[in-house]
Amino acid sequence: RILSLFYAEDYSADMIPRAKDAGMIVMVQTGTAALARKAIAHGADIIVAQGSEGGGHLNRGTIGLMSLLPAILDCAQGRPVLAAGGITTRQDVRAAMILGASGVLVGTAFLASEESNAHPLYKQKILEASTDDTEYRTGYSFGWTYGTPHRVIPNRDKWNVLRLVGGGARAIDKDRMARKLSLYAGQGVGKIHSIVPAAERVAELALGLS
């Protein structure tokens, strides 16, 4: 069993040892080498180096994957290090492996899969977006430490988010929410051109391992 933590903050000081005592393998995603060292000190088994190219909330991330991955590899003490952030194609996987990654973590590409529960409008935005269309923001940190950065495709009525959230989002509002809220996506979004089965996406990415 694997416990995957997406924030290497102080809570991990207690959570990681408890998980390991229960026989779990602990994987921690970080956006800085300092946080990677903290996770390792607490006993993390696997580190995910999340470059600032990634979509969604970024773990203190302002460092691109090409600089971050070698820095975390240097302090990993032989632990596997996975690469995350903007990875979409076999070429991206191959580049990460050449830098020394043991594997990759992929998000946005699987939003654009047939099996994904993402709203159809969200999927369409991903297909339409170019690499230039994502933005690095700190304004949507609800439920996270204030100011936590994230990467999104901004939507046309993005500034209405507070009114929508304050009023409560009902199931019937899903179309409206998909049109108004910023949508999490990484910088690799410009290389996603079709909705395909997840297995096809995995097969494409796996070609980068050889």
Where are these regions (language model features)?
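Acidic, glycine-rich active-site loops and adjacent beta-strand->loop/helix elements
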Residues: 53, 86-87
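Active-site entrance/lid segments in N-terminal catalytic domains of soluble metabolic enzymes
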Residues: 1-78
